[in-house]
């Protein structure tokens, strides 16, 4: 079985893949990448059994083209602001003051190619509604440096934000809140929550192209086994409000 999955799913899906091989003797090949770029490959004719997207937009666009596929929401996520602890120089600094600092470089994912980039633009719009002029300044300031067809390639196994900071590409990065889990081991990294009134809900959705893939989803990923991997890696349930 062949699966294309959003890069943010690498940790839980790798655990799921290992369980499928060890417990069920199922051979599963998973390739990770920005969901928008993966969707383009499917639209161009690439064969796949299952597509796991970080949004519901790409699966719906595929269903419009291939009406037989089944869509299954399976997890949600939120955005957060990631930075180096050394960047926070004053106790009264919060996520918004850091974002608006003219001295700090803000890295983001590439919109359209990577859903995280689209969610980031939605975050900027939410900020603009509450602080006139802030959102437009952030759109000008943000550097789309990952997730695009010609973007920087993050080494496999490295956290995106941590690697960007290490290589001096950015001082701040807007990523998924599930990063909390993988960044705990980095004592020099700080993850700041974004309040609900500003934040954006990321709706992770599966597109099953074959009956076998749908059975696999129904029997494993969306029940206790697969959901435990998702929860352990910082994802929220599909019905989370």
Curated annotation (Swiss-Prot):
Any one GO molecular-function label of the UniProt entry: molybdate ion binding
Disulphide bridges, residue numbers: none
InterPro entries: ModA/WtpA (IPR050682)
One Gene Ontology biological process: molybdate ion transport
Pfam (any one): SBP_bac_11
Organism domain of life: Bacteria
Regions that span the bilayer: none
Family annotation (PANTHER family): MOLYBDATE-BINDING PERIPLASMIC PROTEIN, SULFATE-BINDING PROTEIN
Protein name as it appears in the record: Uncharacterized protein PM1146
Organism this protein belongs to: Pasteurella multocida (strain Pm70)
């Amino acid at each position: 079985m062949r699966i294309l999955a959003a890069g943010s799913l690498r940790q839980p899906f790798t655990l799921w893949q290992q369980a499928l091989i060890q417990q069920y003797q199922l051979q599963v090949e998973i390739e990770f990448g920005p969901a928008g770029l993966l969707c383009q490959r499917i639209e161009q004719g690439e064969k796949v059994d299952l597509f796991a997207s970080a949004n519901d937009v790409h699966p719906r666009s595929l269903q419009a083209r291939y009406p037989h596929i089944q869509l299954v929401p399976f997890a949600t996520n939120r955005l957060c602001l990631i930075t180096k602890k050394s960047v926070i120089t004053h106790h009264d600094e919060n996520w918004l003051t850091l974002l608006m600092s003219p001295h700090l470089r803000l890295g983001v994912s590439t919109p359209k190619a990577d859903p995280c980039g689209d969610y980031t633009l939605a975050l900027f719009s939410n900020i603009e509604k509450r602080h006139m002029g802030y959102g437009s300044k952030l759109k000008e300031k943000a550097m789309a440096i990952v997730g695009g067809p010609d973007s920087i390639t993050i080494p496999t196994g490295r956290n995106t934000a941590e690697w960007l900071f290490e290589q001096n590409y950015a001082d701040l990065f807007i990523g998924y809140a599930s990063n909390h889990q993988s960044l705990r081991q980095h004592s020099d990294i700080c993850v700041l929550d974004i309040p609900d009134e500003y934040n954006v809900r990321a709706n992770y959705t599966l597109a099953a192209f074959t009956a076998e893939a749908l059975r696999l989803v129904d029997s494993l990923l969306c029940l206790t086994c697969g959901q435990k991997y998702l929860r352990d890696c910082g994802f929220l349930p599909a019905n989370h409000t």
